[in-house]
């Protein structure tokens, strides 16, 4: 399957550090960056190299064992190395230092999936059905 990368310039986010992970129960998964943020309301997985560390399904089906606190242990203070947006269905992959990847999979025809914003006015979000707005 061919996935087309967008030509959106994500340089504003490169080098930014994760400074907070939302751990509130019943709230969307999200994180604060040094000068921006990411809100996630779609399936996701956190991968270290070729190993899935934790994913959306883990938190839903085994909340006693898995939560956003597990994500915090991995991502807090990590810096962004790159961001990839695959245009077909607005999948967003965030590459962090040390071979860590946060992969977001938009899966709804009715709801938005994620929002990436920067304090400089950058605002990108996935739309219902798989497109995105920038």
Q: How would you label these PLM feature ranges?
A:
Residues 1-134:
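Surface-exposed, interaction-prone regions used to assemble/regulate multi-protein complexes
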